[in-house]
Amino acid sequence: LACAPPIHRSDNGPTPSEILGNPDYQAMSYGGYRGKTRDDGPTVEQLVDDIRILNAMGIKLLRTYNTSQFPQAERLLEAIRREKQADPSFEMYVMLGAWIEAKNSWAEAVWDADNDTWVEGTGPDHTQGNLQNNSQEINTAIRLANEYPDIVKAIAVGNEAMVQWAVTYFVYPKTILKWVNYLQAAKASGELTADVWVTSSDNYESWGGGNPVYHTADLTQLFEAVDFVSVHTYPFHDSFYNPSFWGVLPSEEALPFDEMTGLTMDRAIAYAKGQYQSVLDYMSQLGIDKPVHIGETGWASIDGTAYGVKGSKAADEYKQKAFYDRLRAWTDEEGISLFFFEAFDEQWKNADSPDHSENHFG
């Protein structure tokens, strides 16, 4: 019998193409902050505890969000290296996030949505990036990828950095494109290990799947420049903001709870699939063919306002598990990596409001 050709790997272990889309490498978005601020980040020892838990769950690929602003990413890589040294069979890989933001992000100003402008203060300049922050994030990503080439398998340039509802910090695609091209040039010159894929992780609309305001020449060039596309989809949030798919139909009201809720969650999954497909459709219109993975989606277990019992009633542990199980089954079958948001609850997300949904996606 003919044997399949062997996979030729470098000393750095499996390649991104062997990991992404492979259900043997389950993915998760990760933040290990225990407290109500990020000032006191987790220690390497605490991160070792976390990755042992995640590994026991079958998670082998983590996504982070910053490189230079906080020490967590570098400590996480050190924690993984320690585990690998102690147990050579231990596997955990990382998609390293580099935070990208506009010039004057987080400035004190008031946004006038009707006129699409800031009415006081300097406000962010969305046409330019924060050069100091962004260059530090990217150059630190290069350093970490080179220091941990057996662990870092991808670099994501920006997190929801192009979606225009991120009014305090978003940039236009040309800024993301600049840094993606910078990383690709670094790979070509040997300044960055070649065994790392480059992407940007953003809302499905930012990747052309919705509002045509995003359909620009710069976005087309970005599609061409990345090694794969990382898409975000959040039916949970749209259960309140765009609830056409959400809720129990009159014909379902008499059904048992599990069946009734299951049908509701099936529609949430269909909604997520539709957003994913919209990106594929737009990319196809451009004549571009790249792998598309889900860089972020999730479901909160608690909310005291819009998504809780007085709102869309989406937030609870039962629906969280139902969403996770259904979406994970589909992505495994389709060969799509799913970075589920997120591994653990993080109190710093909205420290002044303990019941806010952002604190309860873990």
Describe each PLM feature range.
Residues 3-5:
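N-terminal Sec signal peptide cleavage junction
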Residues 7-19, 23, 305-362:
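Aromatic-rich peripheral "rim/lid" segments of glycoside hydrolase catalytic domains that contact
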Residues 10-15, 49, 75-78, 136-143, ...:
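Alpha-helical scaffolding within the catalytic cores
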Residues 12, 74-196, 294:
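Substrate-binding cleft of extracellular glycoside hydrolase catalytic domains
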Residues 13-109, 131-138:
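N-terminal carbohydrate-binding/catalytic regions of secreted carbohydrate-active enzymes
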Residues 26-30, 60-64, 90-98, 153-157, ...:
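Hydrophobic faces of well-ordered beta-strands that scaffold small-molecule active sites
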Residues 35-41, 59-65, 97-103, 120-132, ...:
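The substrate-binding groove and active-site-proximal loops of carbohydrate-active enzymes
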Residues 129-133, 153, 162-294, 300-304:
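Noncatalytic carbohydrate-binding groove/subsite architecture in carbohydrate-active enzymes
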